[in-house]
Amino acid sequence: MPNEATPAEVVEIIGRTGMTGEATTVKVRILSGRDQGRIIARNVLGPVRVGDILMLMETAREAKKLSIR
């Protein structure tokens, strides 16, 4: 079903990004679904630490570094 979220576990915190450092770039391991076991980079807003479970609406996109304009 397309409206279901996919769980992903944070395995590494890469660093802060964005104009004021408001986003954190993390590497997550997809826990279920067709991309199970794949590790991708995502940008996360809010507090996050290694071991947290994120619910991703989309697993195909990888994060790119957010630049300062």
Curated annotation (Swiss-Prot):
A Pfam family: Ribosomal_S28e
Ribonucleoprotein is among the record's keywords: yes
Source taxon at top rank: Archaea
Keyword Ribosomal protein listed: yes
GO terms under cellular component: cytosolic small ribosomal subunit
GO biological process assignments: maturation of SSU-rRNA; ribosomal small subunit assembly; translation
Key words of the record: Ribonucleoprotein, Ribosomal protein
GO MF terms held by the record: structural constituent of ribosome
PANTHER family in UniProt: 40S RIBOSOMAL PROTEIN S28 (PTHR10769), SMALL RIBOSOMAL SUBUNIT PROTEIN ES28 (PTHR10769:SF3)
Annotated family: Belongs to the eukaryotic ribosomal protein eS28 family.
Protein's recorded name: Small ribosomal subunit protein eS28
Organism name: Thermoplasma volcanium (strain ATCC 51530 / DSM 4299 / JCM 9571 / NBRC 15438 / GSS1)
Source lineage: Archaea, Methanobacteriati, Thermoplasmatota, Thermoplasmata, Thermoplasmatales
